């Protein structure tokens, strides 16, 4: 039964597809065709009688099927019936010829009239352009694509390549002129007189140009789960018949665009973007056009060879760049690379072939320990054992490197060629086209780059949350490409000024670029992360060049540098190379170049002056703020008192950047792993990349003196391989860097092995960390600690216990011992307690015997000597200095705990034997009997683990506490570990909300002072931030409890707004509120003044008597006082849902379904293009997580809506009408422009 049902469904789908194809065939016939009755050869194109209506019907079919049903059946049928090549292009070219002729005649004869029915033909031309945009829209397949789209993807891609060739070649690309003519009709209109439809026509023309440039051969990989077969497939298999790569290359596009004046049109729009045009309509299409123009172009190849003086690169593309101008086609360039490869292979064959005895073969057999034999042929193996072993290695099966899932760009719905300009597989131009392209780029930078970058930056700043992967990559690579191009241009052209890309240094641009990089890294969107690294690297290069040029206006530079090296950004930049070894060669290259630029810029600034940045300050012990300081700041800055206090006690301060500290962030094993993995592929690298690797190795080995990080076998073998005859070319400029470093590296390694023979074993394993052995291994000396300057940790304190004052001292002491002992037991510190109990028992015996001897001798007042306490075994004495809970227990027993590392811990002889006996018994008790906390939480919930700003062994923080000061545990500036600084008012109110349930249970919280809400200021001082520091004039007992952020652990202590809010938590209070609502409802929301006074007495009496009322309130309630239960029952029934709403909703739903049925029976299709479904075109975000899948759907709908708006808004209409249409379960109002001539 199910098989029959499935077969029936398939037959129905085939029948509907057959009907659809028949409709498209009829439309293709009715549009028009060659006029064979004409005597002209070839016959001219003749329009059909209903040509305009047919074109509009075709647009409706695209929206109805392809957009709304996520199918590409219409696009496939249109391609098979050759509507674009046989109908649309001839119509547009014929229209362009007529308009051009009319313009020439009008120029010679001003009285000449336009050709007949021009308005009608203009409508046809505009509809043809709309269809061209729909049919050439780049196709992208993602995880959300339907099976129909995946099936048709390959064939449609080939059809689009035919479209591109035909558009560029038919009458030398005259259809491009036709599109420009449509745009010129809009440009002639004054800006204030243009309608949104006119602006959409401009956007439509730009999208047509964008589509022509963006069309490329289909990808082999659709996504990580669905792949096209790759065996035996070459780039030719993705091309349709009679189409070569030269026909659709960027070289051909540039030639056609230059001939048809597209470059001039684009320059006109970009240079006048903010003056003559509505930039919100055309800024993104212009960005996309410039992105697709440049994404495959290597900037260095656009400049003369003299730019790289003395360069001998290993990359074949580089070696051939000097002859690029002589290459006419891309096929010729491929041939030159193959010839170069053949020449290199022939040299290697000759080098390893015997000259005189090659005809007499040699055979060498090697027996392995497991009795197997390995055979090597060739007489060379008899001469050199290294060659024999190398031949064995070469005979091993080579496992091709598998690209990880996160490295697949196609899996994110993006074309694989996004980063081609960085791979060396750049496109080459003929000499004339290269000159035209370079001239266009220069003119664009001189006149429009700053304007366009400013426009799109402002747009994306407001829309950043809606930016999808493709938009982020386009923006970042557009930014990076033009900045790098201008830097290269300025080196050889004195007229080129860095100020022509000055918008790249603006504050908003820097914030957007850095935020895109940060968010992409956090979301593990590695494609955007890669693009962000490229853009950030070029930004740093621009900063460095501007600094070297010593520009007068350096405000933007100082702003960038002051924020560039904040702790958070340094952490991000140093994390990027740590993950680089997991990804592609180009990703690692970007990591290395970014690291090189970061260290270079920071070192450049640190050499000139002390680099000061904005960073988080440590909390000071006291703030010396006077009333005069506050008044002066209020007058100077025109701010209120709260904001002045916020500025004076700001938690941000200027700090000096220690270059050595920043450099140390990069001295880690993962970073070294990335550099070595990158260098292993040295045959694919340029000299400049190899030089940067060894520059970093020099930093590690010499400047940072972290030699242990580079003492590795893989690096030793790699250096040997690079310097071997088969390694780097002897003429390579980078070989000398490798040779010099290798000599120094091996010399230091020999010394280290002689000094510390343990390194013979250490080379075999990763270096050790955080231990005395590891320290000695790395630095060759013992890790001697300066005990004089190391302070012990403050002991834990007890939180306030409910009803503490009412408890007897013995019960309170018992609880404290129970809390501390059970906390240590929970942490698995039984051995600490055993040794402590053993010492107490031993001390008791000594004290008792001492007392017995002295009483007999009449010396009762003499105290016994102090008993020193040390831990034995593997524990060392660290817990006595560092364990806060253990130190608290020692303090509770009576021990004198050390404040510094070199001080002893002892039990004074002044301790009473009775007290020590009680302590011993209590420790024994809770070692054997579990302690049950009254609140049901772990014992540690009663402890407050305080710490000072000068915690552990830190010496650089400023908290005002000196080593000779006593601990002041009541000082609010000794901060509890489990408290953090509330980051916003929202977090503060969330904390208060969490307090409510606890306060109903009777939990007590510390009190604080509520400050007024800060006013939201648009312009605040740089470095300003909110703070909870004390206000001026606060007394010691009024200081608010300070909290501190520490590792993202949220606080369990909260601050209340008032000391009197405990009454508000009384259930009687809420019952009184219920009575008040009942009275207001009964009296229509109004009460007399007498009744308000009566109710106040009534509420106060209930609060004082626990809900009991003794007075007479019949006049207030109009009878007896109702019970609270009856009032609540009345309220709950009055709030029940109204059944009439349900019936009304059912009625509306039934009316909507009837309306939909009537619409479906009507065969007339609407010409509205708004709110259509996604066509999965032009990008999608990565489907690796739910957020990105949602983003992909949003962008897909956004792209379809954008494309449809362009088509519908451009429709010419004689009358405008409004239609309301209901779609499915959503009621959407759609404004439709009808055409009177349908």
Curated annotation (Swiss-Prot):
The keyword Metal-binding does not apply. Residues 1173-1194 have a biased composition (Polar residues). Residues 1010-1023 have a biased composition (Basic residues). Coiled coil: none annotated. InterPro entries: Timeless, Timeless_N. Residues 1008-1051, 1159-1218 are annotated as: Disordered. Keywords: Cell cycle, DNA damage, DNA repair, DNA replication inhibitor, Meiosis, Nucleus, Phosphoprotein. GO terms for cellular component: cytosol; nuclear replication fork; nucleus; replication fork protection complex. One of its GO terms (molecular function) is DNA binding. It is found in: Nucleus. The modification Phosphoserine is found at residues 626, 654, 1056, 1058, 1213. The keyword Transport does not apply. Residues 1038-1050, 1195-1205 have a biased composition (Basic and acidic residues). GO terms for biological process: DNA repair; DNA replication; DNA replication checkpoint signaling; maintenance of DNA repeat elements; meiotic cell cycle; mitotic sister chromatid cohesion; replication fork arrest; replication fork processing. It holds the Pfam family TIMELESS. Residues 1209-1218 have a biased composition (Acidic residues). Belongs to the timeless family. Forms a fork protection complex (FPC) with CSM3 and which is required for chromosome segregation during meiosis and DNA damage repair. FPC coordinates leading and lagging strand synthesis and moves with the replication fork. FPC stabilizes replication forks in a configuration that is recognized by replication checkpoint sensors and protects stalled replication forks against the fork-releasing activity of RRM3 helicase. Present with 952 molecules/cell in log phase SD medium. Component of the fork protection complex (FPC) consisting of TOF1 and CSM3. Interacts with WSS1 and ESC4. This is Topoisomerase 1-associated factor 1. It comes from Saccharomyces cerevisiae (strain ATCC 204508 / S288c) (Baker's yeast). The gene is TOF1.
């Amino acid at each position: 039964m199910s098989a029959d049902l499935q077969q029936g469904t398939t037959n129905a789908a085939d029948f509907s597809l057959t009907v659809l194809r028949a409709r498209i065939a009829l439309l293709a016939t009715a549009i028009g065709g060659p006029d064979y009755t004409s005597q002209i050869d070839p016959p001219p194109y003749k329009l059909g009688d209903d040509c305009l209506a047919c074109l509009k019907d075709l647009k409706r079919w695209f929206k109805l099927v392809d957009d709304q049903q996520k199918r590409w059946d219409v696009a496939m049928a249109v391609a098979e019936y050759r509507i674009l090549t046989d109908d649309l292009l001839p119509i547009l070219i014929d229209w362009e010829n007529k308009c051009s002729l009319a313009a020439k005649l009008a120029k010679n004869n001003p009285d000449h009239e336009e050709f007949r029915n021009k308005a009608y033909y203009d409508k046809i031309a505009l509809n043809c352009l709309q269809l061209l945009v729909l049919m050439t829209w780049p196709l992208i397949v993602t995880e959300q694509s339907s099976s129909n789209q995946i099936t048709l993807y390959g064939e449609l891609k080939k059809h689009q390549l035919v479209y591109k060739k035909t558009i560029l070649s038919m009458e030398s690309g005259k259809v491009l002129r036709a599109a420009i003519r449509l745009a010129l009709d809009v440009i002639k209109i004054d800006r204030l007189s243009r309608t949104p439809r006119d602006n959409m026509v401009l956007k439509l023309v730009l999208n047509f140009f964008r589509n022509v440039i963006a069309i490329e051969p289909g990808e082999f990989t659709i996504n990580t789960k669905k792949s096209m077969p790759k065996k035996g497939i070459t780039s030719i298999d993705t091309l349709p018949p009679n189409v070569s790569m030269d026909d659709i290359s960027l070289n051909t596009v540039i030639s056609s665009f230059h001939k048809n004046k597209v470059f001039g049109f684009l320059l006109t729009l970009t240079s006048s973007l903010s003056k003559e045009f509505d930039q919100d309509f055309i800024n993104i299409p212009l960005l996309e056009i410039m992105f697709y123009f440049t994404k495959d172009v290597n900037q260095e190849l656009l400049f003369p060879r003299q730019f790289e003086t003395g360069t001998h690169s290993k990359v074949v593309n580089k070696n051939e760049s000097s002859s690029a101008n002589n290459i006419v086609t891309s096929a010729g360039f491929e041939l030159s690379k193959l010839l170069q490869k053949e020449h290199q292979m022939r040299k290697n064959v000759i080098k390893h072939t015997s000259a005189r005895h090659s005809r007499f073969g040699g055979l060498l057999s090697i027996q392995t320990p497991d009795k197997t034999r390995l055979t090597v042929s060739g007489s060379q193996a008899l001469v050199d054992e290294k060659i024999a072993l190398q031949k064995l290695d070469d005979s091993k099966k080579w496992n091709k490197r598998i690209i990880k899932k996160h490295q697949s760009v196609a899996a994110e719905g993006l074309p694989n060629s996004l980063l081609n300009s960085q791979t060396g597989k750049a496109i080459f131009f003929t000499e004339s086209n290269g000159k035209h392209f370079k001239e266009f780029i220069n003119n664009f930078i001189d006149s429009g780059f700053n304007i366009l970058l400013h426009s799109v930056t402002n747009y994306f700043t407001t829309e950043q949350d809606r930016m999808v992967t493709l938009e982020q990559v386009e923006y970042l690579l557009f930014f990076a490409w033009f900045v790098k191009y201008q830097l290269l241009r300025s080196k050889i052209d004195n007229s080129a000024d860095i100020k022509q890309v000055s918008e790249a240094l603006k504050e908003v641009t820097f914030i957007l670029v850095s935020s895109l990089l940060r968010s992409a890294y956090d979301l593990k969107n590695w494609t955007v992360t890669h693009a962000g690294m490229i853009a950030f690297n070029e930004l740093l290069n621009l900063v460095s060049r501007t600094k070297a040029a010593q520009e007068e206006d350096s405000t933007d530079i100082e702003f960038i540098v002051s924020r560039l090296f904040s702790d958070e950004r340094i952490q991000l930049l140093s994390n990027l190379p740590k993950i680089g070894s997991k990804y592609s060669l180009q990703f690692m290259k970007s990591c290395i170049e970014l690291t090189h630029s970061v260290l270079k810029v920071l070192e450049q600034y640190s050499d000139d002056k002390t680099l000061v940045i904005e960073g988080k300050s440590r909390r000071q012990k006291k703030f010396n703020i006077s009333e005069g300081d506050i008044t002066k700041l209020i007058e100077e800055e025109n701010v209120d008192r709260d904001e002045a206090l916020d500025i004076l006690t700001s938690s941000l301060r200027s700090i000096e950047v220690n270059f050595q500290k920043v450099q140390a962030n990069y001295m880690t094993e993962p970073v070294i792993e990335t550099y070595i993995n990158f260098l292993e592929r040295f045959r694919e690298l340029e000299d400049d990349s190899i030089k940067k690797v060894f520059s970093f190795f020099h930093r590690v080995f010499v400047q940072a003196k972290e030699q242990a990080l580079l003492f590795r076998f893989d690096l030793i073998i790699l250096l040997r391989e690079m310097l071997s005859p088969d390694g780097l070319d002897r003429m390579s400029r980078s070989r000398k860097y490798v040779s010099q470093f290798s000599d120094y590296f091996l010399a230091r390694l020999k010394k280290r092995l002689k000094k510390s023979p343990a390194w013979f074993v250490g080379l075999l394993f990763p270096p050790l960390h955080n231990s005395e052995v590891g320290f000695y291994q790395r630095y060759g000396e013992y890790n001697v600690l300066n005990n004089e300057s190391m302070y012990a940790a403050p002991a834990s304190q007890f939180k306030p216990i409910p009803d503490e004052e009412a408890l007897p001292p013995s019960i309170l002491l018992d609880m404290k011992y129970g809390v501390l002992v059970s906390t240590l037991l929970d942490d698995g510190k039984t051995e600490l307690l055993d040794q402590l109990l053993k010492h107490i028992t031993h001390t008791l015996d000594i004290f008792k015997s001492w007392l017995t001897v002295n009483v007999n001798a009449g010396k009762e007042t003499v105290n016994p000597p102090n008993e020193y306490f040390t831990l034995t075994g593997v524990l060392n004495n660290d817990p006595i200095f560092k364990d806060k809970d253990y130190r608290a227990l020692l303090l509770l027993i009576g021990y004198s705990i050390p404040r510094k590392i070199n001080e002893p811990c002892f039990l004074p002889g002044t301790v009473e034997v009775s007290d020590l006996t009680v302590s011993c018994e209590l420790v024994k008790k809770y070692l054997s009997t579990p302690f049950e906390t009254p609140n049901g939480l772990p014992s540690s919930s009663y402890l407050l683990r305080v710490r000072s700003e000068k915690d552990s062994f830190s010496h650089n923080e400023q908290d005002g506490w000196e080593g000779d000061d006593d601990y002041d545990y009541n000082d609010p500036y000794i901060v509890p570990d489990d408290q953090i600084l509330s980051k916003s008012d929202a977090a503060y109110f969330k904390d208060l909300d969490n307090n409510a349930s606890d306060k109903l249970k009777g939990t007590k919280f510390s009190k604080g002072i509520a400050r007024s809400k800060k006013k939201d200021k648009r312009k605040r001082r740089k470095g300003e931030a909110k703070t909870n520091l004390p206000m001026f004039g606060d007394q010691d007992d009024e200081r608010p409890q300070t909290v501190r952020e520490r590792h993202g652990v949220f606080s369990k202590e909260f601050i209340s707004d008032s000391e009197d809010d405990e009454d508000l938590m009384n259930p009687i209070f809420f019952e009184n509120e219920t009575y008040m609502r009942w009275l207001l409802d009964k009296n229509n929301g109004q009460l007399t003044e007498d009744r308000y006074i009566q109710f106040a007495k009534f509420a106060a009496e209930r609060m004082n008597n626990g809900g009991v009322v003794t007075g007479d309130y019949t006049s207030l309630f109009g009878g007896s006082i109702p019970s609270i239960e009856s009032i609540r029952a009345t309220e709950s029934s009055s709030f029940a849902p109204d059944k009439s709403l349900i019936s009304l909703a059912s009625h509306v739903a039934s009316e909507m379904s009837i309306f939909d049925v009537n619409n479906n029976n009507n065969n007339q299709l609407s010409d509205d293009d708004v709110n259509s479904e996604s066509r999965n075109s032009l990008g999608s975000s990565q489907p690796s997580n739910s957020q990105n899948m949602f983003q992909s759907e949003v962008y897909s709908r956004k792209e379809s809506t954008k494309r449809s708006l362009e088509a519908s808004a451009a429709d010419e209409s004689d009358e405008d009408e409004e239609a309301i249409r209901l779609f499915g379960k959503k009621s959407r109002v759609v404004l439709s422009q009808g055409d009177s001539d349908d």
